[in-house]
Regions:
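Aromatic-rich peripheral "rim/lid" segments of glycoside hydrolase catalytic domains that contact
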Residues: 285, 289, 296, 300-330
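Short amphipathic alpha-helices and their capping/turn segments at secondary-structure boundaries
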Residues: 24-31, 54-69, 154-166, 245-253, ...
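Glycine-rich, proline-tolerant flexible connector loops at the mouths of alpha/beta enzymes
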Residues: 37-63, 303
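Hydrophobic faces of well-ordered beta-strands that scaffold small-molecule active sites
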Residues: 3-9, 37-41, 72-77, 113-115, ...
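Active-site beta-loop-alpha junctions enriched in small/polar residues
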Residues: 8-14, 42-44, 77-80, 118-120, ...
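Catalytic domains of carbohydrate-active enzymes, especially glycoside hydrolases
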Residues: 21-44, 103-112
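Gly/Pro-rich active-site loop or hairpin
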Residues: 12-23, 52, 149-153, 180-292, ...
Length: 330
């Protein structure tokens, strides 16, 4: 067994929210285009009434994926700790909030749920017995600007070591190990009327040495000194949040606890290589380690562009398939 490919429907946010496809039609199109077999769904985005899952939806969903020969790989669940305006959720409330979503994952046949940092390590700790009972693994998504050793991540790693449960794991997001800011993002800034000099200033700090917080603060200070508006400063700062520069080889450190992967991507060059993420380098880390699980192709360009996602998903699968097939033969 080896790394298996799939798609998260989050990649198709514009197609779904723009009413170009129903949920059922999206799933069918994923299968038709050969960008499965793994299927990742974000609960609150795709399932009406979530986390309550009706028996009818359960029946229809299972029939749908069986008909199209797809496999449930991961269910994206939310922490939503600030869902109330007056206060944040208590730990007890958050545990119950997560348990309902984990139960939904089990009901629909998802073996993994994607969890978020705001849940906090204590909530994750208390969820372990429930996850073990329902046979659903908890995968904390490591997403830029966090790293494996950031203040966000270390408390979870320490708790994982204490609890030592196979149902606690991680979901690496490849945007954390980017090598460049993709053209889609640069073009979006230009279309918004941001001067290229301002974009170049942000890029110079993004590519500099140092911790992400220091580089981001350095850019913001320089941008304000240069007279850029607060709106432009905030827009350009987003590149520091979405794209990290962690070395791909660092993923090996948590490999035994990786339960799913988000194969983040944006743009391709004329040779079919992904511009922002060095896929030959990053996939080699997982293939060399013998990772046996799914990677969801995750196109996030819909934040910046209305360009259709299906063709890009096909390119991403073609790239990753070639790397998987060629592994060990170089």
């Amino acid at each position: 067994m080896t790394l298996k490919l799939g798609t998260t429907l989050y990649s198709l946010t514009n197609e779904f929210h723009g009413l170009q496809y129903t949920f059922e039609e999206l799933v069918a199109e994923v299968a038709r285009r050969g960008i499965g077999p793994g299927l990742e769904v974000v609960g609150f985005q795709s399932i009406r009434g979530f986390p309550v899952v009706t028996r009818q939806f359960e029946h229809d969903f299972k029939a749908l994926i069986d008909r199209h020969e797809l496999v449930p790989s991961c269910l994206g669940i939310n922490a939503d700790v600030a869902i109330r305006r007056d206060r944040q959720m208590s730990v007890d409330e958050s545990v119950l909030y997560h348990e309902a979503q984990i139960a939904a994952a089990a009901q629909l046949g998802f073996p993994v749920v994607r969890c978020q940092f705001p849940a906090g390590p204590e909530v994750m700790r208390r969820l372990v017995p429930f996850a073990e009972k329902h046979r659903v693994k908890l995968g904390l998504e490591i997403h830029a600007p966090a790293t494996l050793t950031s203040d966000h991540t270390l408390p979870f790693r320490e708790m994982y070591a204490q609890v030592n449960s196979p149902f606690l794991g991680f979901v690496p997001d490849f945007g954390t190990t980017a090598r460049a800011i993709p053209p889609t993002v640069i073009n979006s800034y230009l279309q918004d009327g941001i001067a290229f000099d301002a974009i170049e200033l942000a890029l110079s700090f993004w590519g500099a040495e140092g911790e992400v917080g220091e580089r981001m603060q350095g850019f913001e200070d320089a941008a304000r000194s240069a007279g850029l508006s607060e709106q432009i400063v905030v827009q350009l700062s987003l590149m520091f949040v979405l794209f990290g520069r962690l070395a791909p080889e660092a993923w090996a450190e948590i490999m035994p606890q990786v339960v799913h992967i988000h194969g983040k991507f944006f743009d391709f060059d004329e040779n079919g290589s992904e511009i922002a993420v060095d896929y030959p380098r990053v996939l080699k880390v997982f293939l060399d380690a013998g990772y046996d699980g799914y990677m969801s192709s995750e196109y996030e360009g819909h934040i910046f562009s209305d360009e259709g996602a299906f063709a890009k998903l096909e390119k991403h699968h073609a790239l990753c398939r070639s790397l998987i097939d060629g592994h060990g033969h170089a």
